[in-house]
């Protein structure tokens, strides 16, 4: 996978920012399934143990003593089409699953009609695996990660796009730029220190890492970002926040807009 291309064109549908959460799991004896959804990179804490054994930054099940395999079911915060999957086994070495697969469905009318979007694949220890979805034209709101037979996975990302047609917009003023309303980054000049996608986050920044930051410009010109709105609308005002940016905020900014009848991605 071309990681730079994927980051520019797809969002992580497994992000807790979108409201994604763990629905159920077969086991989480050594590590909580909720750690799969963490935004931060996995870490390793030397010599740290909890009541069940070595603390690991990921979802880890106990050793399987019966037939079958472990799984975790995840409810996506917003429905979307899945193009790629990232299964990260960072720091799981000797306790990673031997194989993994992913199923997905669009849950409605109290029915889970699962389809396979990633066939059974071999997993390596301490490795970030990238896989292409086998069903990238269907909309899903639930996924199931299957691991064979047991073990630990640090992070799971499902990269794709929200299905804007299924989003519910309020009959009042709302943030047209929010990622929760289907907006996405189309292109930007630079994002050396902070991703442009952070501009679309629906919450107040916690620190400088939650913003868009470019490297220092040494030549002529200026930095820019192009954002595609999830829904057309009339813009009444802008809120431009530079919280936590003290010696590295822009001196000026400007905003332009246009209406396109073409599907720009």
Q: How should these model regions be labeled?
A:
Residues 105, 148, 159:
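Mid-sequence acidic-hydrophobic segments that form the walls
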Residues 1-71, 75, 159-230, 246-248:
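Disordered, acidic Ser/Thr/Pro-rich linker "stalks" and the adjacent N-terminal cap
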